[in-house]
Amino acid sequence: MSQPIYKRILLKLSGEALQGEDGLGIDPAILDRMAVEIKELVEMGVEVGVVLGGGNLFRGAKLAKAGMNRVVGDHMGMLATVMNGLAMRDSLFRADVNAKLMSAFQLNGICDTYNWSEAIKMLREKRVVIFSAGTGNPFFTTDSTACLRGIEIEADVVLKATKVDGVYDCDPAKNPDAKLYKNLAYAEVIDKELQVMDLSAFTLARDHGMPIRVFNMGKPGALRQVVTGTEEGTTIC
């Protein structure tokens, strides 16, 4: 088996990646497949942190446009990430993976409150740590959470799992001739206005020299290929 090129990673999974063909909720089969792929990394000795989005359950920004207070909507979105985190933790447990769910705010009896030193300790013990509830503050996306937690836990890379094979020069769903980039510099992404993640999250990663790899989690084995150095997806650094 190929050896991993990363010791510690932060895996960002969108909420949409968890939903099935009906476009709603959580597809247990997808969740279980992701748990098995994460287990492969743990068995290779990789330390894994996970951030989940909540868009499969709730999108606060859309309701904000309809008149809901943005702060209230974002709080609801944070709770959606906790629900996804609970589902992921359960799938990991069933795959015999030791996992800990942490929330950015207190949810006594449901999960632990985020604590940096405790998270580091658990990662060193090869436990998967799931970071939920975003940053705990409104107006910040889960991409920002992924970059923030990745920097805090001193991850080697932020792996952004998407439904496409990496970063393209235009939308591949609309243009079959879209060009896939293999490597990009931070400045290129900004200059070309490429859609990798929101600007706040991206500049946070850039300012702290945190590499980002964008890949298609829908491809079986893609996560392992990324971690073992196979030319999969797009690398930004």
From Swiss-Prot:
One Pfam family recorded for the sequence: AA_kinase
Enzyme Commission no: 2.7.4.22
Keywords: Allosteric enzyme, ATP-binding, Cytoplasm, Kinase, Nucleotide-binding, Pyrimidine biosynthesis, Transferase
Activation and inhibition: Allosterically activated by GTP. Inhibited by UTP.
Subcellular location: Cytoplasm
Start and end residues of each stretch annotated as Involved in allosteric activation by GTP: 20-25
Binding residues annotated for UMP, in chain numbering: 54, 74, 135-142
Protein name: Uridylate kinase
Organism of provenance: Haemophilus influenzae (strain PittEE)
